Amino acid sequence: MSFTILLLSLEADPSWPEKIRQAVPGAIAKIFADPKDALADIETADAAYGTVPPELFARAKKLRWICASRAGLGGAYFYDALVKSDVVVTGMHGSYNEHLSTHAVAFLLAFARRFEHYLPQKRWERGPGMIHLPGQTVLIVGVGSAGQ
């Protein structure tokens, strides 16, 4: 039994199709940076990674699963035909928690050291004082799992 997945993403790593084939023997995996280029292949695809625009979805005869390439799937991601279909949509909820949290702390430290002032200068001159972090309070506001 073959399984076809289309990777609809500019960020898709060129090594992913081979990794998918190794993990799922007989799988067919193809990368499309522009979903419009996948019009012929979507008709036989079982799954898609990324965003499947309505005009592409309309041609998807066998599609059973869409794995969104992001965590927050707002209303713009869904459209009537997708909502009314039996296609399962999964997201990356929780996948980026550690990465996002680490990134947020890195920016916090960069701003505390006033990197936004020094970086454009491309040289280090005494400028605005640094924020001394011990004793400071940080409030992290987030509605998703990365902000918890």
Predicted feature locations:
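Short coil/turn segments
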Residues: L8-A12, R70-A71, H93-S95, V143
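Short, well-ordered beta-strand segments
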Residues: T4-L7, C67, T90, L139
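Rossmann-like dinucleotide/phosphate-binding beta-alpha-beta segment
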Residues: P128-Q148
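Loop/helix-junction capping segments adjacent to catalytic residues or to phosphate/diphosphate-binding pockets
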Residues: P14, L39, E98-H99, Q148
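Phosphate-coordination loops involved in phosphoryl transfer and adenosine-cofactor binding
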Residues: S2, D86, P134-V138
